Amino acid sequence: LVELDRPNAVEDRLRVRPDHLKFLDSLGDSLLLAGPFLNDKGESVGSIVIIESESLDTARAAFNRDPYIEAGLFDMVMVKPWKTVVNRMRA
């Protein structure tokens, strides 16, 4: 899932963030990676969330429960299948 914030969404993002984090936690082991995109000032301007899902429809249904989406935070939301080719992630 790739999401880009609508303009001037910082306050809404901060207000809804605790519920968004609870939502991410509720995804359990299906959640592989999540975090914000940042602008030059270090402010959040979007998000990426990668989950393991049995289908694209199941993934969309899960993401539609995200409080960020329910709050209308994003200008653009894109759900796409993804395949790991190289993984050098470090926590």
Across the structure, where does each feature detected by a protein language model lie?
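Conserved, structured core segments of small domains
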Residues: 1-91
